[in-house]
């Protein structure tokens, strides 16, 4: 992976957005039948259980993927009102188009509706998909669909967030626990003398929220000078995050740092900090690396974000699907590490998401 640290960088160019129609996008030939697979019937055996490699290692080992005529990939994503998932979709669709693969994208309207996403995933199974890719809302929410797909010889691939524990399902994305730990370590570096910190959590049922929170609190134990005085869910909602952060700052006016489990909520925290006249005085670390957060980092109102690589993840999911369909062995975890974006390097990532 070209972005495993704060010093190595990757830039994917030319990944264009595709217009979304009626909660579902498809390639021009989206209704064509799915192509056959040399892995059909035994696709789960092609996934190396417990194996983990970076995306660059996997690409170097397996080479450029190719597709048979009629191959169609289906991606079940989250709500596209969250621009992070829009970039994930863009990576998926751009790579599918680059490789001449038919595709179809299914999104949900409610970020917390496991039922809605499950219904979309079940529908995808009936659309002639050669492989199923998904960004599940919960760790087990789409397992029944994954099981059905694998039983039919259809690869199942998770892009970011809820890593399934089912054998044969490939996960493409970062370690969410490490993301939380990275945020805690960064804050500790900014507060060498310690101080009070607060955390704004995502939806309680979200694997990302759970794992990022666990990583953050675990890492705080390595920094005894940091005192977690408040932690509350805002369920990925910016307005709720602003209200909660305002209450936290009223109760603890000497809070020195906030960690928000995504950038959308962090923008709400920033508004609360600004309203208290504390702009630039309270450390604010978000997660995801969305463009709006990076604009605020450039303006000096927002300290840092632990940036993920959704465009890279979406594109890599296409590659993994095609490798599996070609009968190639793939690790169960294709790691796409996150990295810190702050005032020192934000100019390199001011627009878009890698």
What kind of region is each of these model predictions?
Residues 2-13, 19-354:
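A residue-level marker of the well-folded mature domains of exported/periplasmic proteins
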């Amino acid at each position: 992976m070209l972005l495993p640290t704060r010093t190595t960088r990757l830039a994917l160019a030319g990944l264009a957005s595709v217009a979304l129609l009626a909660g579902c996008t498809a390639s021009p030939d989206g209704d064509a039948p799915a192509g056959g697979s040399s892995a059909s019937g035994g696709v789960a055996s092609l996934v190396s259980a417990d194996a983990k490699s970076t995306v660059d290692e996997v690409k170097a080992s397996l080479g450029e993927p190719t597709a048979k005529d009629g191959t169609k990939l289906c991606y079940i994503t989250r709500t596209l009102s969250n621009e992070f998932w829009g970039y994930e979709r863009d990576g998926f669709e751009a790579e599918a188009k680059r490789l001449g693969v038919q595709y179809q994208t299914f999104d949900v309207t409610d970020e917390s509706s496991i039922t809605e996403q499950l219904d979309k995933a079940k529908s995808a199974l009936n659309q002639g998909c050669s492989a199923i890719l998904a960004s599940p809302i919960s760790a087990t929410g789409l397992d029944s669909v994954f099981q059905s797909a694998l039983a039919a010889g259809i690869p199942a691939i998770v892009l970011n967030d809820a890593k399934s524990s089912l054998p044969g399902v490939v996960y493409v994305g970062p370690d969410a626990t490490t993301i939380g730990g990275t945020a805690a370590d960064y804050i500790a570096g900014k507060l060498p003398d310690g101080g009070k910190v607060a955390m704004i959590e995502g939806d309680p049922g979200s694997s990302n929220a759970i794992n990022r929170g666990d990583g953050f609190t675990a890492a705080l134990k390595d920094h005894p000078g940091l005192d977690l005085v408040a932690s509350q869910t805002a369920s990925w909602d910016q307005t709720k995050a602003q209200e909660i952060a305002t209450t936290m700052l009223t109760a603890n006016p000497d809070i020195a740092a906030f960690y928000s489990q995504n950038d959308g909520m962090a923008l709400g925290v920033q508004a609360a900090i600004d309203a208290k006249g504390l702009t630039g005085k309270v450390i604010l670390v978000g997660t995801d690396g969305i463009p709006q957060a990076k604009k605020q980092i450039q303006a000096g109102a927002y300290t840092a974000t632990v940036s993920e690589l959704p465009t890279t993840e979406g594109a890599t999911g296409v590659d993994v699907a095609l490798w599996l369909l070609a009968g190639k062995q793939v690790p169960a975890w294709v790691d796409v590490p996150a990295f810190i974006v702050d005032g020192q390097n934000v100019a390199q990532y001011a627009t878009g998401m890698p």
